């Protein structure tokens, strides 16, 4: 079942992953971010919001 979401968020990695717990690294990777200043458009779903909440200190969100 495929859902189309009108709401998307732009997520940008603003801090390095050096010294960050491995679970937080995995969350950043799940958002599709690899390097500092990488930006990715993601669907605005509860699952994505949870990932962003977990790593809020590493990313910047733009609507």
From Swiss-Prot:
Gene designation: rpmD
Pfam families reported for this sequence: Ribosomal_L30
Keyword Lyase: no
Name of the protein this chain belongs to: Large ribosomal subunit protein uL30
GO BP of this protein: translation
Record keywords, A-Z: Ribonucleoprotein, Ribosomal protein
SS bond partners: none
Family, similarity comment: Belongs to the universal ribosomal protein uL30 family.
HAMAP family the UniProt entry points to: Ribosomal_uL30_B
CDD domains: Ribosomal_L30
One cellular-component annotation, GO: cytosolic large ribosomal subunit
Assembly and binders: Part of the 50S ribosomal subunit.
Source taxonomy: Bacteria, Pseudomonadati, Pseudomonadota, Gammaproteobacteria, Lysobacterales
